[in-house]
């Protein structure tokens, strides 16, 4: 199980195939996505990679966080996430994960924060039908109607679908196909829509319900902290780490 990456949503566009068909794609940009630390079975009880992306000023950063980035010898990151990985998929601390970590044609799962809609009624939020247009109904055409209670149980149960705040939820979209990658600009183009607004942070990782392509780099494609060309970490080196 390989690590994922943290990207920012740039927006949507389309690309054309050789047959002339157009494919709607979402552009995701990797903002210097680097490995910050390891979570090991012996110390933490599970195996994971801590990954950071983006840039952040240290003026208002807590001292503990500054020390964490200093220990990893990387610039402070705006967004930090953990990705569960297998023991043979641990990447070196400080390594920068490249866009060709994912290969064209493979499927990925993306997770983001949905667009906020503010306070919404039952018809918009839950697709309720509303009340009748005539036959005595006035003013309340878009209300939700009865919430289902009477003397027994004498209350409205929790989690009842009602008007309220809509959006700003953690949403995962499964099985989006990678259409193109651009290593120089750090871009990943995936087919279809991705949750969230432009500039939102997106977690991208290998699809859980699809097989990993045979040509996908293992344990990953990355650039070393000293500026060496992108490379794949040897499995033997990772086992001894």
Swiss-Prot record:
Residues 139-166, 214-241 are annotated as: Disordered. GO terms for cellular component: cytosolic large ribosomal subunit. Keywords: Methylation, Ribonucleoprotein, Ribosomal protein, RNA-binding, rRNA-binding. SUPFAM superfamilies: Translation proteins. Methylated, on either Lys-155 or Lys-158. InterPro entries: Ribosomal_uL3 (IPR000597), Ribosomal_uL3_bac/org-type (IPR019927), Ribosomal_uL3_CS (IPR019926), Transl_B-barrel_sf (IPR009000). One of its GO terms (molecular function) is structural constituent of ribosome. It comes from the Bacteria. One of its GO terms (biological process) is translation. The keyword Ribosomal protein applies. The modification N5-methylglutamine is found at residue 151. Residues 229-241 have a biased composition (Low complexity). PANTHER family: 50S RIBOSOMAL PROTEIN L3, LARGE RIBOSOMAL SUBUNIT PROTEIN UL3C. One of the primary rRNA binding proteins, it binds directly near the 3'-end of the 23S rRNA, where it nucleates assembly of the 50S subunit. Part of the 50S ribosomal subunit. Forms a cluster with proteins L14 and L19. Belongs to the universal ribosomal protein uL3 family. This is Large ribosomal subunit protein uL3. The gene is rplC.
């Amino acid at each position: 199980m390989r690590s994922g990456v943290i990207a920012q949503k740039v927006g949507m566009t389309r690309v054309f195939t050789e047959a002339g068909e157009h494919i709607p794609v979402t552009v995701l940009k990797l903002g210097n996505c680097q490995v910050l630390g390891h979570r090991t079975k012996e110390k933490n009880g599970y195996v994971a990679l801590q990954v950071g992306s983006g840039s952040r000023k240290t003026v208002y950063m807590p001292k503990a966080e500054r020390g964490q980035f200093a220990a990893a010898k990387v610039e402070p990151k705006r967004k930090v996430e953990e990705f569960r990985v297998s023991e043979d998929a641990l990447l070196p601390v400080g390594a920068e994960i490249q866009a060709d970590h994912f290969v064209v044609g493979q499927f990925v799962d993306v997770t983001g924060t949905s667009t906020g809609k503010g306070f919404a009624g039952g018809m918009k939020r839950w697709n309720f039908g509303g009340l009748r247009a005539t036959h005595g109904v006035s003013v309340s055409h878009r209300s939700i109607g009865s919430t289902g209670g009477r003397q027994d149980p004498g209350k409205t149960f929790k989690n009842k679908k009602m008007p309220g705040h809509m959006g700003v939820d953690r949403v995962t979209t499964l099985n989006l196909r990678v259409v193109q990658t651009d290593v120089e600009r750090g871009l990943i183009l995936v087919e279809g829509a991705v949750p969230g607004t432009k500039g939102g942070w997106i977690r991208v990782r290998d699809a859980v319900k699809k097989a990993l392509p045979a040509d996908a780099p293992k344990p990953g494609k990355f650039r070393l902290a000293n500026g060496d060309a992108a490379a794949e970490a040897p499995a033997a080196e990772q086992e001894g780490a």
